[in-house]
């Protein structure tokens, strides 16, 4: 598990072998490694650091132990999961219906929110 402090990480999904598309952007509001932390063996996403900086790292076994014992951590994880699903849905709609200029503006605003 990685917890970005002052960097941001793109979540990419593979398309047609070697191509990919960004489906999410994670900054200090979230964590990288959510599927694995939830017990899913492999994440369907590839994480790429887009804006350099620092992040905290936690072993999955330690995260799962804390998750099983902490109501507050569960609440935060569920909230983050919900917000990430909203972001993924918004990204899909934007990629389908917006112009390149609008998509770039959205991406710039999202990166600004995360630094």
Where are these regions (language model features)?
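Cyclic nucleotide-binding regulatory domains
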Residues: 1-51
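A short local loop/turn or secondary-structure capping micro-motif enriched for an aromatic residue
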Residues: 19-20, 64-66
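A generic structural signal for short hydrophobic patches within well-formed alpha-helices
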Residues: 31, 63-64
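Polybasic "coupling" helices that flank or enter modular domains
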Residues: 51-52, 67-115
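Conserved active-site beta-strand element of glycosyltransferases/polysaccharide synthases
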Residues: 56
């Amino acid at each position: 598990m990685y917890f970005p402090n002052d960097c941001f990480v793109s979540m990419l999904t593979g398309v047609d072998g070697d191509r990919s598309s960004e489906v999410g952007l994670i900054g200090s509001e979230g964590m990288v490694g959510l599927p694995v932390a939830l017990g899913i063996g492999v994440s369907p996403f590839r994480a790429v650091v887009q804006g350099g900086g620092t992040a905290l790292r936690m072993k999955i076994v330690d995260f799962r132990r804390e998750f099983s014992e902490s109501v507050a951590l569960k609440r935060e994880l569920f909230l983050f999961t919900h917000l990430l699903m909203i972001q993924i849905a918004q990204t899909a709609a934007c990629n389908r219906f917006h112009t390149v200029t609008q998509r770039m503006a959205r991406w710039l605003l999202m990166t600004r929110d995360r630094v």
